[in-house]
Amino acid sequence: MRQHRQFMDRTHYLLTFSSSETLLRLLLRIVDRAPKGRTFGDVLQPAKPEYRVGEVAEVIFVGANPKNSVQNQTHQTFLTVEKYEATSTSWQIVCNDASWETRFYWHKGLLGLSNATVEWHIPDTAQPGIYRIRYFGHNRKQDILKPAVILSFEGTSPAFEVVTI
């Protein structure tokens, strides 16, 4: 049996670790952070106001590590593309991250900051109309010496129009 080392932190909590590697792993865990003045899911780069069939709509959001969503079932997808239906005055999902027309890219930054880029390669079959892109994720928050908390968030792009050629 390995001998345990005891460490005292500045807040006077007694911690017991079986190895220095465990302490290092605890200290190196980086939580997700949003840029100052922003929250997770905020749009950093909106879509253009208008696209034609065959073009790529792209939106960049304040993101978080996608690994945080593995154990959480709040949302069943990282993204949706939705079309506004005037007759029902509601948004209808036309595709998600399982669709061939969509792409999701996570860009890891420094010190827990990251972005998520969502692309929709607008297919020839897309109906003209008003669309938006939504992003769903989970951010990891952890205070020193406390267990991590996983929080869900979502972001929605401003509406944009798809027109036919």
UniProtKB/Swiss-Prot annotation:
Domain of life of the source: Eukaryota
Tissues where the protein occurs: Ubiquitous. Expression is reduced with increasing age and in late-onset Alzheimer disease (LOAD) patients. This reduction is even more pronounced in patients with an affected mother.
Note from the entry: ASAH2B/ASAH2L is a partial paralog of ASAH2, resulting from a partial duplication of ASAH2 on chromosome 10. It has a polymorphic start codon with a single nucleotide change of the original ASAH2 sequence plus other putative translation start site that might lead to several potential ORFs.
Residues in coiled coil: none
GO biological process: ceramide catabolic process
Any single GO CC term annotated in Swiss-Prot or TrEMBL for this entry: membrane
Similarity field: Belongs to the neutral ceramidase family.
Any one GO MF annotation of this record: N-acylsphingosine amidohydrolase activity
Leader sequence segment: none
Pfam families named among the record's database cross-references: Ceramidse_alk_C
Organism: Homo sapiens (Human)
Identification of the protein by name: Putative inactive neutral ceramidase B
Gene that encodes it: ASAH2B
